[in-house]
Amino acid sequence: MEFSGSPMALFCCVFFLFLTGSLAQGIGSIVTSDLFNEMLKNRNDGRCPANGFYTYDAFIAAANSFPGFGTTGDDTARRKEIAAFFGQTSHETTGGSLSAEPFTGGYCFVRQNDQSDRYYGRGPIQLTNRNNYEKAGTAIGQELVNNPDLVATDATISFKTAIWFWMTPQDNKPSSHDVIIGRWTPSAADQAANRVPGYGVITNIINGGIECGIGRNDAVEDRIGYYRRYCGMLNVAPGENLDCYNQRNFGQG
C-alpha cells in the first residue's frame, strides 16, 4: 500500500488504525449490547428492585477501567472469563425463577435484603465489609467508606467495584481473574485443601465460608447453572472442577 501524504498524516493514519483495532479487541467485541440483554434478559422485570439500574453502557465503561478484564489471553480465555464473571454475579443478584427458562433471573437485585450493617452487600458482587469498601474506593477513585450507597445508586461505580473484586487477590486468595484465565498455580496449602483450578475455586473465593466444603448445595449448583448457560451463549466449554464441595474454604488455611 502506497501513502503519498505528509509524515504527520501517515502517523495519524497509523495511530487511528491502531486505536480502532485496539477498541475492536475490547470486551465490547464479545459482549455486545444484544448479548448483554439476552444474558440478563429479566433484569428489568417489574418485580426486580434493580429494574432499570444495570445498563450495558455502565458495564462497558466499568470494564474499560480494567484493561485486563475480559481481554486477556486468546478468544476462548476471554469468553470463559466473561461467562464466569456473569455466572457468579448473576447468582449474587438473582431474583430466582422470573420465567420458565432457568438461570435467567440474574441482576434482579442491587441491595442485600439484610441492611442492618452499613456496609451490607451492594452491586453485582454484593460488596460487603468496610475494608472492601475502602479498598475498592481507593482503587476506583471514589470515597466509598463515607458514601457506600454510591455502589447502589451509580451503575458504573457498581460494576467497577465488582470488577475490582474480581481482578484483585486478597490475603491467601488468588484473584478470580487469574484463576479463570489459567494464571493461578495452587500452593501446597491449596493442594492440601483440595483447591484446584476451575470455576469452583472462584466460588470459594467469593463465598467459600458458607458454600464450600459442605457437600452438594443449591447455592453452588445455582452458580454453576448460570455459568453453564453463559458458556453456551458464548460458545465456550466450561472446563473442569466447577464446584467446591470438597474444598476447604480459604479462611481455614
Curated annotation (Swiss-Prot):
Record-annotated active site: E92 (proton donor)
UniProt cross-references to InterPro entries, sorted A to Z: Glyco_hydro_19, Glyco_hydro_19_cat, Lysozyme-like_dom_sf
Induction remarks: By TMV infection.
Catalysed reactions, as listed in the record: Random endo-hydrolysis of N-acetyl-beta-D-glucosaminide (1->4)-beta-linkages in chitin and chitodextrins
Cysteines joined through disulfide linkages: C212-C244
Signal peptide boundaries: 1-24
Gene Ontology CC: one annotated term: extracellular region
The keyword Secreted is annotated on this UniProt entry: yes
Keyword vocabulary terms for this entry: Carbohydrate metabolism, Chitin degradation, Disulfide bond, Glycosidase, Hydrolase, Pathogenesis-related protein, Plant defense, Polysaccharide degradation, Secreted, Signal
UniProt subcellular location: Secreted
General function of this protein: Defense against chitin-containing fungal pathogens.
Protein name stated in the entry: Acidic endochitinase Q
